[in-house]
């Protein structure tokens, strides 16, 4: 289920009452009881390393690379994937990565009822706890689609909302996607160049396919040169 164009066009973006990211990129709720979303790294020259959409059965070489380079990341796992590939999920924790929630089935969360939002988060937390042995404290909404209603439900489950400052768009690389590899390379290069002025960034990347994982492995030497720290977020 996608976002309704009518809902987006009719939303009051000036007052932005719901802090709806999909409409306004809002990450700082006006409601005092809700924490702001994590979007950037406050530490200078820091690459906040995050990967969405895992785990799956093709990750061994990628996880081997991260382990060899002593790289730790925040991994946003889909609940159904954890159910289908439990050994890969267990390795994520064993290798020292932070395990976070990316919902059960990767829907636009603001299109769901309260009960559906709760289920997407709760059952993902539960399968991670049952399979991996930890209770996640962080989550990322698929497509970044979150508003105050969804944030409040996540907050009630003890989950901090994490978005991103920079998007590699690696998920859209050809042949599965629409963008040539050269465009994804440029996206990475643009983020890498930010490190030269001491920026702290949270980068959206994916472990969804071999080509997205290969892209990070190829770019890592440049990332390491430009940023003093390449770290998970929690």
Where are these regions (language model features)?
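Active-site beta->alpha N-cap acidic-glycine motif
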Residues: 1-108, 116, 120, 125-137
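Catalytic domains of cell-wall/extracellular-matrix polysaccharide-remodeling enzymes
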Residues: 83, 107-229, 234
